[in-house]
Amino acid sequence: MELGNQPGPGNRPEIELEWYQYLQNTVGVVLSSYGWYILLGCILIYLLIQKLPQNFTRAGTSNHSTVTDPDEIVRRQEAVTAARLRMQEELNAQAELYKQKQVQLQEEKRQRNIETWDRMKEGKSSKVACRLGQEPSPSTSTSAATKPKQEKQERKTLRGSGYNPLTGDGGGTCAWRPGRRGPSSGGUG
């Protein structure tokens, strides 16, 4: 056996050495440029591979729990229909109560309007001072008609007739002045 003719670890042919150097340079450049990205990508792929089988097993167990028995399907549909009917009846009952309440409120409003109209015909105030079900006392309505006239005559003004809060008259510590006319910044001058 001739040992000189066989390629060994130190005696590689030229083409093999060139290919090895080319591969080493290419891999080295790629790893030096994108090494961290490749590492993070590998970690993400590993985590996804760990999570995906768990999701598939969850989906598989939920598929197994569905019933394919036709009788069970019919029972479930009947239960759903019964629940819908029950909810619809409750909704109809609530709607009926709401309509009755609205009719009652409309009737109360109509009664108040009639009372207001009657009071206006009698010459009394149009505003109803008493609550529903209470009768206004006649003594308060007659004395109230004469009293406001006396109060108006006796009432004295709090400030002088020349008081104007915008001009500052009246002894206040601060006086308001109107601002300059014209644009506040630049413009034609």
From Swiss-Prot:
Main location class: endoplasmic reticulum
One protein family per Pfam: Selenoprotein_S
Biased composition (Low complexity): 136-147
Domain of life assignment: Eukaryota
Protein's membrane topology: Single-pass membrane protein
Stretches with biased composition (Basic and acidic residues): 114-125, 148-157
Record carries keyword Cell wall biogenesis/degradation: no
GO cellular component terms attached to this protein's record: cytoplasmic microtubule; endoplasmic reticulum membrane
Protein name (Swiss-Prot/TrEMBL): Selenoprotein S
